[in-house]
C-alpha cells in the first residue's frame, strides 16, 4: 500500500470526485492558478480548467453565498478557506442559509457543499488565524463536521463529504499536511459518523480527534511502555454526526475516560462528550472524567508559549495518570 501525505490524499479525493461527478467544483482564494495556499489543489486547475476550479475575490461571505446558491441548483461546490478562522466572515451565509435551508424548505432543497481548510494552532500565526471552530459549527443543526487525523481518513472522509447532500465542514490541520500514511489505490469511503479505534486497551479510554488523536496514540504507547497502563484510543473522525456507541462501549470496558482536544475547554467538543458519558455510562465509571485541552486564552504568536498552550504528549500523559489515580 503506497505511503502518501495528508495533502496528497485530499488532492486525490478532490481529483477523483471532479472526474466522477461533473457537478463537483472547487472555489476559493488562489485555489486555481496558484494551486492553493497550502498546495492542496496543485495541478488540478491545469488538469480540469476554469469551470471546475474557480479563483474567487477575497470575500469569504461572497463565495460562500455563491457556493450555497449554486448547490441549490445541483452543483456540489468544495469551498476552500485559507484558514478556517476566515469562515467567521461568512457566518451568516454558512450558519443561516447553509445549515437551515433543507429544514426551512421542508426538504425541497439541499445544500451539498463542502467547506474545507486548516483549523488548528501550533504554527505561530497568532490568535486570529488559529481557531478550531468544530464545536461552534457542530452546534448548528444541519451542519456536519469531520476532523481527519491521518491521510487515509482525510481522503475517505473528503469523498464522503462531497457526496453528502448536507453542508459538511472538513477541518484539516496544517501540521499534518506533510505527514505520510498508507492509503490504498482502490476506491474507498470513510462513512461520516463512524469513529475509529486506533489502539485497543483495557485500563483507560482516550477520546480525541484530529491531530490530537495522533498525539494521544503516541502518549498511549508511552503509557503502556513506561507505566504499564493499557490505553484504548478512540479517534472520533466525525464530530457531527457523533459515534456515541463507540465512545460508550469503550468507556464501559475501561471504566475511565480522558478527553483530549485542541478546542478551548469552555463549551468545547469534549464538554458535550463528557455530558454523554455522564448521562449514559455514569455507573460504569471508576473515576471522574478528565480533560486535556488548549489553555483557555487566545493563541499566542510565541512558539514557546503556544507549544505549552496546546495539548502535547507530556500533558496527555499527565492527564492519563490523574485519570488512573
Which residues are covered by each model-predicted region?
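Thiamine diphosphate
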Residues: 1-171, 307-308, ...
